[in-house]
């Protein structure tokens, strides 16, 4: 009796799984390709002269986009180096694990919420202004413009750089620290001979990653830019469609943004991407010998300053939100409508992202052709080449020729947010799926267990927690998204971030603070669910 081929894994038959993966790739290709096609057609016809819009305004916006990203990324990494060095040296520092968990929050918070936290500290009515008044030296710091953009970008990206640098420090062999202690090396010698070579190898990819995040930072620049002099390409795209309705200019800006993004990704691919492999939140004392008192004092000061820089805006969100009239806010029908809309769109986007990611992961594992498997493996990540505002702009221009774009708003928000979450979902699902396949493929083949029965009985127990993690993470990303809804939002489709932006625009700051707290709590709750699921999965694996 001939055994069933080992290729028969889960979800469906071996022939169906690559088809499902192909459909997932087709979804991404349609989403990105449709936007590009619309932009190309708009540039080449319809009476629009897109080439004429490659003018001094566009190049000024492009220069500012690059300049603010360079300034933000260099400052973020420059500040991260001493903080990461101090955190690694003080492995037994009280609250070290708490600080590292705190450093994971900025990227988990919706950008709009974090921006309000930054303004609560550095704004004209912020904490620093109040302290200066109390000291008799009143000052009104101007948070809007390049200063505010830099402060916010450092808040987002410095903690990320610290975590990546700590991962690099973890790769230093124990023997290096032993030898340094035996030779009596001082702090400068250790940094120059042991630490700097490791940091230097990580810098190109790290700076490139932070630069990419700053170039595609839409919400931060939209809220803190303060005017035409501090406008990036993505904000200019939004303004050209939402306020001026100038499709030709939007096309020129979008192609410039796309070219810049592709260039950055090419540089990242050549320099290599930083990894958090080996990173831990627990104390890992690998250094030998006791640091000098002056060195330890310096480390404590640096850690404290880094902690305050990240903690104060987060505390500002909580304090400002609690001072708002939450009872009145929660009694407004529009607020509950926005919450329900956000949850419904977020749930739909997360479900779609997990389903399509599973299709890609299953197709990759079932495919024996290495080249095709690599396409399934990297296909989801390619969507990151196009920022959400670019995809939204392309489809907005395309849909207006056939229907009212705002009628299609829910579908566009769900599909774009699902696509943007897929690279992260694939990364969470792939290890568990591959492990389950390697363990069970042969036995299931011999027993003839396949299709839905295998998924239900064999594979689902192994991938249930990763699916929960991916779902919670994707839903949190969708809840805090402003890029797509900023273009397609209207009175008929109001999400929590869109309502928050409206309240900020009408200078209802207390309402905005309350909404920011609600949005932040929702997103952080989902992130905590994902984190708990990850921890439970790790414990189960160790057992």
UniProtKB/Swiss-Prot annotation:
It is found in: Cell inner membrane. GO terms for biological process: thiamine transport. The keyword Isomerase does not apply. Pfam families: BPD_transp_1. Keywords: Cell inner membrane, Cell membrane, Membrane, Repeat, Transmembrane, Transmembrane helix, Transport. Gene3D superfamilies: MetI-like. The chain crosses the membrane at residues 19-39, 64-84, 102-122, 142-162, 205-225, 250-270, 300-320, 343-363, 379-399, 406-426, 468-488, 510-530. GO terms for molecular function: transmembrane transporter activity. Residues 62-266, 339-530 form the ABC transmembrane type-1 domain. Signal peptide: none annotated. Disulfide bonds: none annotated. It is a multi-pass membrane protein. The complex is composed of two ATP-binding proteins (ThiQ), two transmembrane proteins (ThiP) and a solute-binding protein (ThiB). Part of the ABC transporter complex ThiBPQ involved in thiamine import. Probably responsible for the translocation of the substrate across the membrane. NCBIfam families: PRK09433.2-5 (NF006956), thiP (TIGR01253). This is Thiamine transport system permease protein ThiP. It comes from Brucella suis biovar 1 (strain 1330). The gene is thiP.
């Amino acid at each position: 009796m001939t055994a069933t081929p080992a290729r028969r894994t889960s979800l469906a038959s071996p022939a169906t799984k690559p088809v499902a993966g192909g459909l997932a790739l087709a979804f991404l290709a349609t989403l990105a390709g449709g936007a590009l096609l619309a932009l190309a057609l708009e540039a080449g016809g319809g009476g629009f002269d897109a080439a004429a819009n490659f003018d001094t305004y566009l190049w000024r916006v492009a220069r500012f986009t690059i300049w603010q990203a360079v300034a933000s990324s260099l400052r973020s990494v420059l500040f991260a180096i001493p903080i990461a060095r101090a955190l690694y040296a003080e492995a037994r520092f009280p609250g070290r694990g708490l600080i590292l968990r705190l450093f994971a929050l900025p990227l988990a918070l919706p950008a709009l919420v974090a921006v309000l936290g930054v303004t609560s500290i550095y704004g004209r009515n912020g904490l620093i202004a109040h302290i200066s008044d109390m000291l008799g030296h009143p000052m009104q710091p101007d948070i809007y413009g390049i200063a505010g953009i830099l402060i916010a970008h450092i808040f987002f990206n410095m903690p990320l750089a610290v975590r990546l640098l700590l991962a690099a420090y973890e790769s230093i062999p124990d023997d290096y620290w032993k030898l340094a202690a035996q030779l009596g090396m001082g702090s400068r010698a250790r940094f120059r001979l042991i630490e700097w070579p490791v940091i230097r190898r990580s810098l190109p990819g790290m700076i490139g990653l932070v630069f990419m995040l700053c170039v595609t930072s839409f919400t931060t620049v939209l809220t803190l830019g303060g005017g035409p002099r501090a406008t990036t390409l993505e904000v200019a795209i939004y303004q050209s469609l939402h306020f001026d309705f100038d499709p030709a200019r939007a096309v020129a800006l979008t192609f410039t943004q796309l070219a810049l993004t592709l260039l950055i990704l090419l540089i990242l691919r050549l320099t290599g991407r930083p990894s958090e492999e080996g990173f831990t939140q627990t104390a890992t004392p690998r250094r030998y010998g006791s640091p000098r008192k002056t060195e330890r004092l310096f480390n404590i000061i640096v850690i404290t300053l880094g902690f305050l820089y990240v903690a104060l805006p987060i505390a500002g969100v909580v304090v400002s939100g609690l001072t708002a009239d939450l009872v009145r806010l929660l009694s407004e029908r529009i607020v509950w409508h926005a919450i329900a809309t956000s949850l419904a769109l977020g749930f739909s986007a997360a479900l779609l992202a997990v389903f399509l990611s599973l299709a890609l992961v299953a197709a990759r594992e079932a495919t024996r052709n290495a080249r095709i498997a690599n396409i399934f493996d990297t296909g989801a990540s390619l969507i990151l080449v196009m920022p959400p505002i670019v995809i939204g702009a392309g489809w907005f221009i395309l849909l207006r020729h056939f229907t009212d774009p705002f009628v299609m708003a829910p579908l566009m928000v769900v599909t774009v947010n699902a696509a943007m979450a897929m690279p992260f979902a694939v990364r969470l699902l792939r290890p568990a799926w591959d492990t389950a396949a390697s363990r069970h493929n042969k036995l299931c083949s011999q027993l003839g267990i396949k299709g839905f029965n295998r998924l239900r009985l064999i594979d689902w127990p192994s991938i249930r927690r990763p699916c929960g993690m991916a779902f919670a993470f994707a839903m949190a990303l969708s809840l805090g998204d402003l890029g797509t809804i900023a273009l397609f939002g209207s009175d008929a489709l109001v999400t929590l971030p869109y309502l928050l932006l409206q309240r900020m625009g009408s200078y209802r700051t207390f309402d905005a603070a309350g909404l920011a707290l609600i949005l932040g709590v929702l997103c952080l709750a989902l992130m905590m669910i994902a984190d708990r699921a990850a921890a439970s999965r790790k414990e189960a694996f160790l057992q």
